[in-house]
Swiss-Prot record:
One of its GO terms (cellular component) is plasma membrane. It is a multi-pass membrane protein. PANTHER family: UPF0283 MEMBRANE PROTEIN YCJF. The lineage of its organism: Bacteria, Pseudomonadati, Pseudomonadota, Alphaproteobacteria, Hyphomicrobiales. Its main location: membrane. Belongs to the UPF0283 family. The chain crosses the membrane at residues 77-97, 111-131. Residues 1-43 are annotated as: Disordered. This is UPF0283 membrane protein Rleg2_1967. Residues 23-40 have a biased composition (Basic and acidic residues). It is found in: Cell inner membrane. It comes from Rhizobium leguminosarum bv. trifolii (strain WSM2304). Keywords: Cell inner membrane, Cell membrane, Membrane, Transmembrane, Transmembrane helix. The keyword Heme does not apply.
Length: 359
């Protein structure tokens, strides 16, 4: 008969030392710090903002078109010389007109009175032209003044300046029926928004959203027309003349859309600012490199020569339209997204857009 198993022997109680794991790790870190060799570091440390960090913002468009700004008006010797010779020429024309009228009175009184009447009509027409050109230049200056005042009002703590800017913007766009809904919204919320940046952002969303949509349609239509004419035109000079015609037409339409309504001199100034911006940023680059840069090497090799030139000129027209939009828009892009060249590629080449690939 087997014996029942006996209980295992019990271990006598003993004392142990417990060391904190965090303290041990901390001590090891201190020892590692003590063992680290001395090093020298440069004091020229450049801190990159989060919004500019390409690792934090991988979708950031690094090739976006720079914002166009008006050129500074500076007095030059050329302007002084042109003004002096203009005054001299005006005096010569005045003396010639006086001599002509005197000779006509000598021949017959009715010829002299007829010349005086014609001169009066011409002077009145010139005065009307000067008034129109001055009004157009003043409206363009008002647009730039509103933009500058809005940028200054956004850093203020009191909403007085922001409300004044919004009031001026409403007055500028009051003749445009597409802003009626936005003006009604701003009037309904008057006094409720007291933060200057939010007030400017509200005005931008309510007043400029429909205008930006129409401006984009203007740019797309002009770019498509330029692409089509370039693809079918027999001569390069025809392409150049039509691109220039569409550029002037697009800039004028953009200025009128945002309340500028420039005259002839105002159009020359806007055209000069746009071309100067494109020349500085290197946006007027015509050749195979632009197609490969924007559309990709594979597609550029498959495009025909005329179609490739049409796409190039269409994209160049789109850049002109974006620059004109920057110059004519009464508020800078803050609450709304600024359009880029990539927004118009799908319209010029539907096969590249997602909707163009869907059956």
């Amino acid at each position: 008969m087997s014996k029942p198993p006996s209980d295992p022997p019990r271990r006598p109680p003993a004392a142990f030392t417990y060391e904190d794991e965090a303290t041990e790790r901390h001590d090891n870190g201190r020892q590692a710090e003590r063992r680290r060799k001395p090093e020298s570091f440069s004091e020229n440390i450049v801190v990159t903002a989060d919004e500019d960090d390409p690792f934090l913002n991988p979708d950031k468009d690094l090739s976006a078109v720079p914002v166009a700004t008006p050129l500074r008006r500076r007095t030059s010797f050329g302007k002084i010389a042109a003004g002096a010779f203009g005054i001299l020429l005006s005096l010569g024309i005045g003396l010639w007109t006086d001599s002509l009228i005197r000779d006509l009175f000598t021949r017959a009184d009715w010829l002299g009175y007829l010349a005086l009447a014609v001169l009066a009509v011409g002077v009145l027409a010139v005065l009307a032209l000067v008034i129109r050109e001055t009004s157009g230049m003043m409206r363009l200056a008002a647009v730039q003044a509103i933009k500058a005042e809005a940028e200054a009002a956004m850093v203020e703590t009191r909403p007085a300046k922001a409300r004044a800017v919004v009031a001026r913007l409403v007055t500028l766009l009051s003749a445009n029926p597409e802003t009626s809904k936005g003006r009604a919204t701003l009037k309904a919320t008057e006094g409720e928004v007291i933060d200057p940046p939010h007030l400017i952002a509200l005005a931008e969303r309510e007043l400029l959203t429909p205008l930006d949509r129409k401006a984009r349609a203007l740019i797309v239509n002009a770019s498509k027309r330029v692409s089509l004419v370039t693809a079918v035109s027999p001569r390069a000079v025809v392409d150049l003349l039509y691109v220039l015609y569409e550029a002037v037409r697009l800039i004028r339409a953009m200025a009128e859309l945002y309340g500028g309504r420039p005259g002839t001199l105002g159009m020359f100034r806007l055209l000069r600012d746009v071309l100067a911006h494109l020349a500085v940023t290197g946006s007027i680059a015509v050749g195979d490199s632009l197609v490969q840069q924007v559309l990709g090497h594979g597609l550029a090799s498959k495009l025909s020569a005329r179609l490739g030139e049409g796409v190039i000129n269409g994209l160049m027209t789109a850049r002109i339209g974006i620059a004109a939009m920057d110059l004519c828009r009464p508020l800078a892009f803050h609450a709304l997204k600024r359009p880029g060249i990539g927004d118009f590629i799908g319209d010029l080449t539907p096969s590249m857009s997602p909707r163009g690939n869907t059956p």
